A protein has these predicted regions:
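Short alpha-helical segment of the dimerization/phosphotransfer core of two-component systems
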Residues: 14-21
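Conserved micro-motifs of the catalytic ATP-binding
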Residues: 31-38, 69-72
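Short helix-loop "hinge" at the ATP-lid/N-box region of the Bergerat-fold HATPase_c
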Residues: 88-89
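Short beta-strand/loop element within the Bergerat-fold HATPase_c
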Residues: 95-105
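Short conserved segment of the HATPase_c
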Residues: 118-129
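Glycine-rich phosphate-binding loop
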Residues: 135-143
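Glycine-rich ATP-binding loops of the HATPase_c
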Residues: 152-159
Length: 173
């Protein structure tokens, strides 16, 4: 489908973006059931994530420290990080930090940003709730929590110092 004028090109671009968004939503819903588990390095997940979000990441400062291995469904974990990073890019301020750490039999994956403090972090995990002037459906963090629970873990959000922290934890096998 070739646009005939700039307005048509704009509409076509908008339609493509909406189809991509709806595709991601359907994929998120499909991943609510745990899939295959495999061991992999979180750095490998970052390579996939950065390729998917290449345009959104351009011009942004994202610091990545994912030095751990996990055993989980890689597609579900990719969707979790995609949702968390997408929110940080929409609502947060640079630098955005994506990191992992292990503590107490759990691996934690966090996306941290320097956005404004939020009034109700826990409420953001409810379906239909959005932070700020969001344009989405308010399902991103709800799906993050459900996916994390499907992997045997959980999701959380809090303010730590000058940063908003959105993360998930998974059990270490």
């Amino acid at each position: 489908l070739a646009p005939k004028d700039p307005r048509e090109a704009q509409v076509l671009d908008l339609l493509k973006k909406e189809v991509a968004r709806l595709t991601r939503l359907v994929e998120s819903l499909a991943h609510l059931r745990p899939g295959r588990r495999e061991a992999f390095a979180l750095e490998d997940l970052w390579l996939r994530l950065s390729a998917l979000m290449q345009d959104r990441l351009r011009g942004r400062r994202v610091e990545v420290a994912l030095g751990h291995r996990v055993e989980a469904d890689p597609e579900a974990l990719l969707q979790i990080l995609l949702n968390l990073l997408d929110n940080a890019l929409k609502y947060g301020q640079d630098p955005i930090r994506l990191l992992s750490r292990v503590r107490g039999g759990r691996v934690y994956l966090e996306v941290r940003d320097r956005g404004a403090p939020l009034p109700d972090y826990e409420g953001l995990f409810q379906p239909g709730r959005r932070g700020g002037e969001g344009s989405g459906q308010g399902l991103g963090l709800y799906l993050v929590r459900r996916l994390a629970q499907g992997l045997g873990g959980g999701a959380y959000a809090l303010r730590e110092g000058e940063e908003n922290v959105f993360g998930v934890w998974l059990p270490v096998d």
